[in-house]
Amino acid sequence: MSTIEERVKKIVAEQLGVKSEEVVNTASFVEDLGADSLDTVELVMALEEEFETEIPDEEAEKITTVQAAIDYVNSHQA
């Protein structure tokens, strides 16, 4: 089983069409990885599906980096 960090990074790379080497913890989805607002919505939906959780809009707005996504999933896993 992959770690949460590995799973998040894989989803980010797939959703944003970037190389996995570019998906570092400090990377901003918009500034570093070239995501637009639609990309970020789709990314949140993919994270919700992968981790079987619901991310409220107000929380989703705060998930702007790879590390923020990892931290959110870690803190909301049962």
Curated annotation (Swiss-Prot):
Post-translational modification summary for this protein: 4'-phosphopantetheine is transferred from CoA to a specific serine of apo-ACP by AcpS. This modification is essential for activity because fatty acids are bound in thioester linkage to the sulfhydryl of the prosthetic group.
Protein's GO biological process: lipid A biosynthetic process
Positions of the Carrier domain: 2-77
Any one GO molecular-function label of the UniProt entry: acyl carrier activity
Subcellular location: Cytoplasm
UniProt keyword Lipid biosynthesis, yes or no: yes
Modified residues (O-(pantetheine 4'-phosphoryl)serine): 37
Family that this chain belongs to: Belongs to the acyl carrier protein (ACP) family.
Name of the protein: Acyl carrier protein
Organism: Pseudomonas syringae pv. tomato (strain ATCC BAA-871 / DC3000)
Lineage, opening ranks: Bacteria, Pseudomonadati, Pseudomonadota, Gammaproteobacteria, Pseudomonadales
